[in-house]
Amino acid sequence: MTRLPLGSSSIDIAGPTTNWWDQINESVQWQDGIFYSLCASYALVSAVALIQLIRIELRVPEYGWTTQKVFHLMNFVVNGVRAIVFGFHKQVFLFHPKVLSLAILDLPGLLFFSTFTLLVLFWAEIYHQARSLPTDKLRISYISINGAIYFIQACIWVYLWSNDNSTVEFIGKIFIAVVSFIAALGFLLYGGRLFLMLRRFPIESKGRRKKLHEVGSVTAICFTCFLISCFVVVLSAFDPDASLDVLDHPVLNLIYYLLVEILPSALVLYILRKLPPKRVSAQYHPIS
């Protein structure tokens, strides 16, 4: 009785399905197409943030640099830098020493952290004011935490510049993951608190419902994106096949940056698109 070569047929079937990922990753055309698409996406989000900043400034120029204006300015900068990085991806991923490539890829991520934790600071101030709690130390805490993060990361880069050590590079990735986890906790803590406080507010109004939707949506989006970032960075620290710092992982880069930065930025900018009300002149008195 003749035996059928089941092993070879299963390999023939599995081969095309397992190789398409490698074929895309190793294709220069696919690499260029994906990274230039990321460049265009970041440039679009950056332009939207700049347009919104200009609209706010034209609407209320007398308010100075409010949290809302700073948030949109930082969004413009972060997404603009990412667009430039991916526009010159061939040079960025192949920099020598390697620490230059790591720094250029990681710095926008730290700026993204600073940009979105600005919302956490804003919500914390609102929550503390509503609870009659002191707010004077909140901004100091925000600046101190960000300053400490940039200082530690700079020390890691300087060490890698002088001594390209795989252990220190591993520590650097874990540090970035911890930073993302801190941001996720910040949104869960203060976004969640503010959301629950608004839900318990006794007076029902259209403004309350809008603010409830705004806080809930932004909290869910930002908590999710920072948690995904934490998970992927930890995974890449232990598994080289999940690394984001190489040219031949374009599909992984596309999925990661879409989920972690581009879509969250676009959605939050859309949710926070409402312009602040114009200041009523002191000389104007409405007809009663």
From Swiss-Prot:
It is a multi-pass membrane protein. The keyword Transmembrane applies. It holds the Pfam family THH1_TOM1-3_dom. Glycans are attached at N25, N165. The chain crosses the membrane at residues 34-54, 76-96, 102-122, 140-160, 170-190, 218-238, 251-271. Residues 55-75, 123-139, 191-217, 272-288 are cytoplasmic. Keywords: Glycoprotein, Host-virus interaction, Membrane, Transmembrane, Transmembrane helix, Vacuole. Belongs to the plant tobamovirus multiplication TOM1 protein family. Necessary for the efficient intracellular multiplication of tobamoviruses, probably being a membrane anchor promoting the formation of the replication complex. Constituent of tobamovirus replication complex. Interacts with TOM2A and with the helicase domain of tobamovirus-encoded replication proteins. This is Tobamovirus multiplication protein 1. The lineage of its organism: Eukaryota, Viridiplantae, Streptophyta, Embryophyta, Tracheophyta.
